[in-house]
Amino acid sequence: MFFLFSYCAFAEGSKVSEVRFEGLKKTKESYVQKLLEKYAGMEEENVDIKEIETLLQAQGLFSEINVSLSSEGEETPHTVIVIKVKEKITFLPLPFASYSSDGFMGGFMLMNMNAFGKKYTLVGGGIFSPSAQTGMLAFAKPAVDMQHPGFSFYTSLSRKNLEFLNFAGDTVMENKYFTAAADLSVSEKLLPFFTCSIGSHFDMADVLETDEYPVLYQWAGTMSFSLQNVNWNGWYLISQSASLKGELGWSSEDRLIGGCSFKGELQVPFVPRVRGILSGAGAFTYNQNEVFRLSKSSGASAILDSKFRTDFIAGTGFTVEAALLKRKFGTVSVYGSYEYVIVHDFDDTFKSSNGPGFGGKLYLQQVAFPAVVMGAAYNIKRNKWQYVISVGVNF
């Protein structure tokens, strides 16, 4: 429950002398104070309580936020911003499972979404399915401002029995792989809504039980730019975001490789509990081995086969999401969507399809990520449904 308190009655000209937090347990006060340091010395009539709520909601660390202004001091009146919070559960061992049109997937993750009390993210664990076994470790430190850059690291090892499908759903490639990947990047928040990052990415694939491929390696330097603006309306964090990422590198096949990806999202609240989401995403690779082809997630597509692979994909869609109820345990929502996607197929032609989707989500109030996601999408051109039910992690 969030409350806005009128501050018109406070003495004119009173300035903010302190931002006072109550209820912090794991979160370091120095971290959240830094988020709000611009309010120090601000005239109290210029304090935007809704903006403070949005800044804190965007951290994903608090289930309850109560902001008020307090006038203190008789001889020299000053204003204190009082913020009472209740922290979410951000550290937990998390078993998860997912069942989709492509089969079962499960695993276990040890997740800390507020490591060191500064919203550092530390995740480690394994993902298992009949066709793949993956171990992974990830760490991320967010960029706060120009003086405090961000840092992220990701690595994974997998043994996979993968088949690649073309647009029609036919198997065009099937092999057993041992793969490894690593990603390292640093980021700088140049403006409150604009972040730039540079890094490097490494991939390795050893195709087992065949001599057709040698062990494949590729390395690339990466650069990305992202824009994001959020606004809390009491039900959702309404977001407008865009990002662009490019990579350029070299492969073990002695050739220059590259690629580019983009995504954008515009959210509009129709009423407080109903929002529209216009989204788009796409990617292409240049000169990369077919083993490293893109999946449907690069185009934010739900209607394609999960085993489909391509070197070019672009998709756009529109979603309407409505929150049915909000209780102490969390929020339940339903959504309907429609998407269009175009891809470059294995036969060197471009093909497209479109179709509707629908589903529901459960966001638990006390944890920092979705708890249950159920969805289905229909590919009109192929007359085929794709569906997924996941518990613990949003796949």
Descriptions of predicted regions:
Residues 1-6:
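Bacterial N-terminal signal peptides
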Residues 74-77, 272, 327-330, 366-368:
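Short, solvent-exposed loop/turn segments that connect beta-strands within catalytic domains
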Residues 76, 84-234, 240, 294-301, ...:
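Gram-negative/organellar outer-membrane beta-barrel architecture
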